[in-house]
């Protein structure tokens, strides 16, 4: 998979779930069906129980393969009580599995660090080295 795995210093401005074309225009996406409430724009997803399904990976235990990040590919209102960037179960979603995409996190990263998800919790973290312990993915 040719997915961005390191933090870039000169990333263009953008919002979570937006594909970044700051370095090149190559990217690859595929469609899937959300199967839980943890599938949201700009978040990592893992394979669901059935072919063509995905479930959230951010903030929960990772039990299957990480497939990519959910793309913001349609208008989602930011007004009113229905303003959510979370997809409901059964919604169609687009997943980026190659290229650069914006994610939004509380953690601070520096240029060149690697992006990891902790398998037990789904927490996103940044490290200077690729994890070899098997406790993290990506």
Name the predicted role of every residue range.
Residues 1-138:
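Surface-exposed, low-hydrophobicity beta-strand/loop segments enriched in small/polar/acidic residues
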């Amino acid at each position: 998979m040719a997915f961005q795995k390191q933090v870039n210093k000169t990333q263009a401005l953008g919002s979570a779930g937006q594909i970044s074309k700051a370095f090149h225009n190559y990217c690859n996406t595929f469609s899937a069906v959300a199967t839980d409430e943890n599938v949201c724009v700009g978040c990592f997803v893992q394979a669901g129980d059935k072919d063509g399904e995905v479930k959230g990976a951010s903030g929960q235990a990772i039990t299957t393969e990480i497939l990519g990040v959910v793309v913001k590919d349609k208008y989602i209102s930011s007004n009113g009580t229905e303003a959510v960037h979370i997809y409901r179960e059964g919604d169609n979603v687009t997943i980026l599995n190659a290229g650069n995409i914006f994610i939004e996190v509380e953690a601070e990263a520096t240029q060149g660090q690697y992006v990891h998800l902790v398998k037990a919790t789904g927490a996103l973290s940044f490290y200077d080295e690729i994890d070899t312990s098997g406790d993290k993915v990506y």
